[in-house]
């Protein structure tokens, strides 16, 4: 994987195979990812989330991957309905776009099970709406680094305020 290059050129990141796999298997356990899941992948594969919590977690769990090069709310809503997508990660703006879409009610979103957000400030009201208006049974937020993997995350069952205002607790392997 590569860093974002916020202070210059992108840098490659060295990470042990053991650490990469532990991030992926922790993600599988935390979200309950399984071979029955259909994962709409909107996160880039060149950094931590897309690679470790996306591709590798899906391979470890046997989940079906549905890549999206660029998020488009109309295409995403149609794909959720057509493919029975169960896992939808993304920045808060993705959920805001879905919640505010004028045609949301015309799409069958009943298969959505896992929402994972982070990467930006999250308004509490947005997470309340995700809980109240979308069918997700698991809604979590996390914080991670390409260099280290998922450092902390909320867990299934945390309330909207916890999901929106914290990055949860340290994940296995972090202190």
Where are these regions (language model features)?
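Conserved AMP-binding A3 loop
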Residues: 1-22
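Short beta-strand->loop structural element characteristic of the AMP-binding/adenylate-forming
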Residues: 11-14, 41, 63-70, 140
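Structural detector for helix-capping/boundary residues
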Residues: 17-18, 37, 43, 83, ...
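Conserved G/P- and acidic residue-centered "switch" motifs that form tight phosphate/ATP-binding loops
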Residues: 5-6, 62, 119, 144
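Conserved AMP-binding/adenylation subdomain of ANL enzymes
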Residues: 21-38, 46-87, 101
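Gly/Ser/Thr-rich phosphate-binding loop
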Residues: 82-90, 99-162, 172-175
